[in-house]
Amino acid sequence: MNQFTKLIAAQLNLKEQAVENTLALLEEGCTIPFISRYRKEKTGNMDEVNIEAIAQANEKLSEMAKRKETILKTIEEQGKLSDELKKRIEQCWDATELEDIYLPYKPKRRTRAQIAREAGLEPLAQLLLFQRERNPEQAARKFVGDKVKDVEAALQGAKDIIAETVSENEQSRNQIRGEFRRGAIITSKVVAKKKDEEEAQRFSDYFDFSEPLKKCSSHRLLAMRRGEAAGFLRVSISADDEQCQDKLKRHYVHGFGECQTLVGEAVDDAFKRLLKPSIETEFAALSKQKADEEAIVVFAENLRQLLLAAPLGQKRVMAVDPGFANGCKTCCLDAQGNLIHHEIVYPHPPRNKKSEATAAIQRMVKMYQVEAMAVGNGTASRETSDWLHSIDFDHPVDIYVVSEDGASIYSASKIARDEFPDEDVTVRGAVSIGRRLMDPLAELVKIDPKSIGVGQYQHDVDQTQLKKSLDTVVMSCVNSVGVNLNTASQHLLTYVSGLGPTLAKNIVEYRRENGAFASRAQLKKVPRLGPSAFEQCAGFLRIPGAKNPLDNSAVHPERYALVEQMAKDQGVTVKQLVEDKALQKKIDIRKYVSAEVGMPTLTDIMAELDKPGLDPRGEVEKFEFDASIKEIEDLQVGMVVPGIVTNITKFGAFVDIGVHNDGLVHVSQMSNRYIQDPSELVKLHEHVMVRVAEVDLKRKRIALSMKGVK
């Protein structure tokens, strides 16, 4: 059994056997999507969230085990590792407690207490702590000598030793932590000499701010930390000093007298000089970590919604990157997303060549049989969209507004240069907008998630944890949808379970040299793609039109024989079984349960036979803004207008209502009932109706409400 199984099972409230099996699969190199989809019997039908939690817990415990090895070695080298201490360290699995145990033995720079110990004052410190000496000054005289010049120095040295002892005592530290947990206050003040700077005004809400730390939301804490990093704010976390000191004294000072006074002074010094700064730093780090985790969860959920946005599918698309002076960049794409034509038109000021631009658009739509248009949502988007809606075409053309976030990042990237070496960044950016409409997932995986514009303080959080979380989300989304083996880009294939950059490149090269894959089994001919990689990736790769219909489904090749047996028992071929719903309903899956295959897998197989290769993302919806509203000045309080959710945070949702500035629906304005998390009510890119609650023309801020709006 894995050494961490019991700990993880208890921590996550999961069954030990399921945790043990999951850890074994992870150890074998299985990916989370693979385990979740194809090893349900072993995991007890766990979802990706639980499997990811097990993987993270195992990683943390492994790191702690390594830390314990270092600690044990260090203490042993000092000759201070007793059997009791060793046992305590080995049994400890709380990071804070572990560091507290280690603190008295931790190598540190030469402290006042160490200097006092070197001067032989440890016995005097113990004498004072015992608090039975009636005349401490007289006792201190015995310690005056070469290293201690007088009684005062002796007593001060003893107090320094007591202060360090108190500050390194586990109970003392936990007492102060308790006070901080109950009553710590986070305070933010403006740096006086920077108060009037324009950039500082972004943090004006925090110029004189104070709040209990336990009530401080993640977005407020991250905003304060950003202001602090920029040099505009001073942020501190503190508890009630007097209460903390009283608590310590109740533990260390017994009765009244000269000894007690000296010990009390040492305790006060321990708190102010050593304990308080240490615990403040600890709580600052813990609160930042908690805020980071919350912000990363928000970002990850937004990214998931964005990646799983409904695709238009394989249709001929005209992509339009709007602009005024630089014109509107138009790119015509075929149904596979290949660039077949591009040109620039100038319908807006300052050139105002609207009639020529209209004629050019009509010509391109007819020539390339354009079925849909993707209009970027940046500069001149509203004007361009209105203009395109006014044009008459000889066949129906649907017009969609598409987010441009990150398109400019993509257009200058190596991926874009490799795809379009002969085109400039404007063409590449426009192509990306068009492809996002056709298949958001396939296009957005090419862009650094942090550039997609759906985060909350994404540049302020732990970047390593953020990248880890977002990579996990991308991989989860790619594998939940499945990937067309014959059309997927190298970059998209990289995220398929079991592949990675090298095998993705090898697949694309094999495809280029040998033509389209006819079956999943052919994957085994790809250089370096061995049995393990095949097992991990095969179920997530699709081959539309394959001879075996299972090759275009989520049924894993390891279960083909089972489906063939089902078909044989019905007296038909697999192809006939897939095409005949009535036959499928006749199958009693309980007959096919075995030691390896249980009801969860069989249920999944039947769902795939019913709708093989079904895309879970749904269908794209058209949207139009209120035609009477084009600028923020057109808004009036009380108006009810349509909008698109562009970003979701812990404090609310931002909604584009077509006036160049997104409005905010604060979480308190989302419903008449209490809402803890905005994502309970809205999804990214959801079409919503909102009421204008407030308009601040000077600051270009719009407050919106969804209360009572249908």
State where each predicted segment sits:
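Low-complexity, acidic/Ser/Thr- and charged residue-rich accessory regions of DNA metabolism proteins
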Residues: F143, K149-V151, F209-S210, Q245-F271, ...
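Long, charge-rich intrinsically disordered scaffolds of nucleic-acid metabolism proteins
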Residues: E97, I101, Y400, G406, ...
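Short, ordered loop/turn segments at secondary-structure junctions
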Residues: Y38-K40, L129, D240, P322, ...
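C-terminal accessory/binding modules appended to enzymatic or scaffolding proteins
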Residues: N13, A310-L312, M475-E509, A627-V665, ...
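Accessory alpha-helical DNA-binding modules that contact the DNA backbone or grooves
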Residues: T31-I32, T43, D47-Q114, A119-K149, ...
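Duplex nucleic acid-engaging cores and interfaces of nucleic-acid transaction enzymes
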Residues: N50-A53, K60, M64-A319, A325-D422, ...
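A glycine-rich phosphate-binding loop feature that marks nucleotide/adenosyl-phosphate handling sites
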Residues: G178-I185, V320-F324, G378-E383, V402-I409, ...
